[in-house]
């Protein structure tokens, strides 16, 4: 698969897969369907079986997603796709444990069985793209005494909170997250994965075609562990002998039975890639935690009552100094600090009443705490960078960048007990993004034209494990 994907492949992406599948025994118990802008997929079996099901059932979506990530990475890094495949082979694959290597190979086998020219190096590069492009490559170029392209910088694009005890309406955990990304990426980040692995916990998480981890990291497992994160902006550092972040994130989602285990799995072999502030809750104990997973510092805070908000701002002074040295805590014009202020305001305003309905409002909020007015732009919790005339220097985002909040997800402890969450594809506020008028007004982004589509918001929809389209 390369940038020359045909129009028929892209057209096939829009079709709804039937529940009845071919007779290949590896596809047993797997299925997929479309609902309200989301692709739901149920995967079940051994690692290689889960991978094959994923690759076969989502083959056209994986090809489309890979085309988009290839375009984005090669444009920003100024390197051809074989460069990223080489990194996947030399830096990433040797540090992938057998269980997940088998699943990744299974995805490649599945997409090939469905007729796509995609191999395991493409799949590994796709899974690792978040940590390779903005973390590994800048570190590598620095080691070589070279200057990194300005676009390759750890971003800060998500809004989230987790609350429990006296902070919530029923005294139990509520969690919320919006994925911020480039619209060409985010419009494809609309898959609900229902995974029943041979080992570990049952998983329900959102994600992107071809990824074995969530990527924007919102999900719940059958042990009652509720998980999300937002990225640490302007992060610097890499441990070349560490375990890829996407492996640690998937393993923690699958195997963590409590907060301590989640933290240990994320810290073990930390390579510094895709560094995040993790918000974690344990439905069984009603405890929540906030893990700032830097490379040199990984501070952890825990609460049985209260809340944590997160919008890409580091908190720990040592981490700010050593892991995110370019972050300015006093620049209130930046999206990270402005959203930090608004997140605190919103939660304090509704303290003691937080539930999933208010969580949806939080993710949809358009108040700009810097300009003190309601305006959907880069400083609102529901981000709309495409209408912002100002750049975001922290991650070299240009004026009118086609990026922002692309999905919203909410869940409470009762939903987690039944392994369910509510999600909206598109802007959490419900506004649509239309590609043609945007590109006409901003032709500097025409390099994205063949992959940038309309991103129309769907309704808030609830998804549950073992769900079928009729539910």
Regions found by a protein language model. Give the residues of each.
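N-terminal mature-domain region immediately after signal-peptide cleavage
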Residues: 19-260, 267-272, 279-302, 335-471
